[in-house]
Amino acid sequence: MCSISFLVLVSISFSMFLLSLNFMLNEYCVFLEWEVVSLNSSGIVMTFLFDWMSLLFMSFVLLISSLVIYYSKEYINSSY
């Protein structure tokens, strides 16, 4: 189970890294608004901003998370 999580996180991290390079070279910026809840006439909106720096940050966070999962698997296996 840990190896599947590790591989999924590494692959998403790699794709985020490539996507950040694409955004940087083409100067893209995606602004996404999602209305989470709508009560009567008011709503709660969640806003996302995706640019090259945020995608690069997410790729490194996912890479570090995958390495933590890999290390924990190795640490648990070595204790027995």
Swiss-Prot record:
Molecular function via GO: NADH dehydrogenase (ubiquinone) activity
InterPro entries: Proton_antipo_N (IPR001516)
Recorded GO CC terms: mitochondrial inner membrane
A Pfam family the protein falls into: Proton_antipo_N
Key words, A-Z: Electron transport, Membrane, Mitochondrion, Mitochondrion inner membrane, NAD, Respiratory chain, Translocase, Transmembrane, Transmembrane helix, Transport, Ubiquinone
Residue ranges of the TM segments: 4-24, 44-64
Compartments where located: Mitochondrion inner membrane
Documented EC number(s): 7.1.1.2
Catalytic activity reported: a ubiquinone + NADH + 5 H(+)(in) = a ubiquinol + NAD(+) + 4 H(+)(out)
Topology versus the membrane: Multi-pass membrane protein
Role description: Core subunit of the mitochondrial membrane respiratory chain NADH dehydrogenase (Complex I) that is believed to belong to the minimal assembly required for catalysis. Complex I functions in the transfer of electrons from NADH to the respiratory chain. The immediate electron acceptor for the enzyme is believed to be ubiquinone.
Family listed: Belongs to the complex I subunit 5 family.
Descriptive protein name: NADH-ubiquinone oxidoreductase chain 5
Organism: Ceratitis capitata (Mediterranean fruit fly)
Gene behind the chain: ND5
